[in-house]
Structure formats: C-alpha cells, structure tokens
Amino acid sequence: MDTDFPVSLSPAFLKVTRVRGQACPRVCAPNLPRSVTPSTSGRWATRAARSALHVVPAAGTAPAPPPPRALRPAPGPPRSAPLAPPLRRVVQSLGSSRGSRASCCSPSCLHGDSASQARGSEPSSSAERGWPSWSGLRGNSLAGRPEGWASGTPRLSKHPQRSLVPEFCIPEIPSNYLDKTEVVKAPKSRQNGRLLLCDPKEKLMSGSNKEKPQKSSFGRRPRLSSKLCTSPTQIPGGATVFSARKETSSKKIEDKVSLKSSENRPSSRSIETNRQFDLWSSSFLKESSGEVNKDLVLAKQEKNSEYCLEDIEENLSDSTDGDGEEDSNNEDDEGPAKKETRAPLELMAEFLRAEMGRDYQLAKKLCQMILIYEPENPVAKEFFSLIEEILLKEKAQEEEEEEESDEDSSSESEVDSSEDGSEDSSDECEDGS
C-alpha cells in the first residue's frame, strides 16, 4: 500500500509543467520497514529523484498534459528477479521520499485542506500504516531468488545504516586553535634563561634558551624564543649589589697585594748587607787587577763582617726574648721561615771565585757569611772545614819554610865563621915560619 504525501510546488515549477494552481500534487512512496535503511548515494539518488516524482491531480480538476521532458512515466511493476533489483527500487523511492519530506516537513508549506488531510492521514503506529512485516519482505525476496543462492537472511547493502532525517556534519574546531594562532607567551613563573650580569654601565642581557619547534594540529609553527633586554636603570638593585661586590673584591685584592709587597720588600739590614757585598765584589775585582792591596781589602771585610755579626746577634736576642714564652708548635712553624732565608747570589759568586783563585782567607770569610744566612747549610759547612784544613797546611808549610830558612842562615853563618878561623890560623903559621 502506497502512502501519499501532499507536496507544495513552487510557481516556477508550475509554469514549467503547465499545471493549474488548484491541482494537489502528491508524491507516491513505497512501503518499507524501518529497519531497512539503504544508502542513497551516487547516480541512484539522482535516478530515484527523477523517476519517483509524478503528479497526481486532485478530483474536480482537469488533468494537464505533462511536458515531454519534465516528468518521466512511473516505473512498471517489479520483476521476479534476485534480491538486488528490488533493493535498488526501494533505494530510488526512498531518495524521492526523503527529498519530499525535507521540502514539506513544516505545516506552513502545505495548502489549506491538504495540510489537515495529511495530518489526519498520518498513522499512529507502523501497524496502522499497513507496512509489510519483515517476514513478508523476506518471502518476497526469497520468491525471486536465483537457484545458486543459499537460503537465509536477505542480503542488504554494505553501506552503514543511516536515518531518514538529514544530517549536517560540522567540523570540530580544536580547543587550542586560538592559542595556536596567537603568539606563544611564556609564563611569568617560568625561567627563560640565565641572567648574565656585566658592568653596571653596560646593558644587562639574558639569553633565553631557544625552544625547539613543535607540531600543532594545523601544521608546523615554531615557538618564538623570548629575549629579555633590560637597562641598568630598570634593575637598580642588581647593579648596586654588583657594584658592592666589586668594591669588596677590589679591597680584598688590594689587601692581598699590599701583604705580598710587604713580605717581598727587603729589610734595611738586608739592603745594607747587599751593598756591603757589592763593595766586597768590587774590591775583589780591583784586587785581582792589582789596584788595591790585600791588607786594605781584608781590613774592610773584617769591619763589615763585624757589623753584620752585631746586627744578627741583636736579631737573635730579640727573637729569643719573644720566643721564650711560646710553645713548641710556634717553633716548628718558625723553622721553615728560617730555612727560607738564603744567602744572596752575589755572595755565593764571590765565594766561588775566591775558591777557584785559591784565596782561602777570603773564601773562609765568605763562607762564614754564608753560614750566617744559612747556618744549617751542609755544603757551606763542608767547605768551611776544608778551607780551615787547607789554611792549617799552608801555615805548617810556611813554618817549615821559615825554619829551613833559619837553619840555612845559621849554617851559612857557621861556614863563614869557620872559614874566617881557618884563614886566621893560616896567617899565623906563615908568620911563625
């Protein structure tokens, strides 16, 4: 049983088809259960739209002849064919019925009494509509089934089921679309980089770590690396702290330099001793050239050595008076300080020259001065003992030479006296004869 739905036609359509305005057009849609929802896509939808529309004139009006290309004749009865052809026919009719329902879903589109008739003719349930059951449709499909098909449920379309209500697909907009389109702003609590403090006069720069570009839902959009550039006027606190630290560090450096300079400064006595050594070296050079006598040089050296010994004794007495109350730990600490005092290089050079020139008297005095600077120097002690032995040997040799010279002189005097006595006796003999 077919259900008729009244459709309102536009005036342009009436002009083209030459149908009177009193005609009540109706669209015939075939009966179909709710469970069968074949898809109307592709050329089948257009073919259904063309073949399903046909005008049924109302009673009391003369039918108008249709134009040659406006409408096509209604299709004939279904053939006894396999399951696929009736399903296609159903698809075509469904496409036409969907289009007609979409166009006349509201009651304002209907004309007068046709709207009330359509409302009154709508059944309240599927049983009143007179739609065939699923078993009936199954029997019709099995009657026209070919021989090769197996028994069972009818094959429906492979497309997913769709409802008869038109659906509108609205694309989903991601929630972070606006955030991605705008410039990425780093939060305040986040550290963009390390603050590099320079001189307070210069600008303070902070280089932020460049972030890697990340993929967004709409393509590649690299994040902007934020760089902060602030002048020293904007950060007075940091500049003051930096200047205070700089002042304290400069003061510490100045104190260290002053201490080092005071430690490295030679004392007045050491300067005097250096001058004395210079005089000795010059006198030694003059002596080697033959300009000055040895006696004068030795006298000057003895005087200078006496002054040096007096100064050293005074220093030792002062240190012993102060160190008498101190512990042994302080003495251990002072030990390396005493060891650090070394004899000047000029004194060592003069000593070596005297030793090579075999001037053992001068070498002995220079060795004594070296021992004054370095009393625990083993090399100086060995040289001093060797020089003393050499001097003793020289003294012994000189004494032996003097004795030999005395003996020679005495023997010579005795020989002279004997010669004189023999001459006197010979003279007396000659006189007696």
UniProtKB/Swiss-Prot annotation:
Q: Where is the composition biased (Acidic residues)?
A: 308-334, 397-433
Which PANTHER family is this protein grouped with? GLUTAMATE-RICH PROTEIN 2
**InterPro entries in the record, alphabetically?**
ERICH2
Segment Disordered: which positions?
Answer: 56-86, 113-161, 189-273, 308-344, 394-433
Bias category Polar residues: which stretches?
A: 114-127, 259-273
Question: Which segments show compositional bias classed as Basic and acidic residues?
Answer: 199-214, 244-258
User: Where does the record place Pro residues bias?
Assistant: 63-85
Name of this protein: Glutamate-rich protein 2
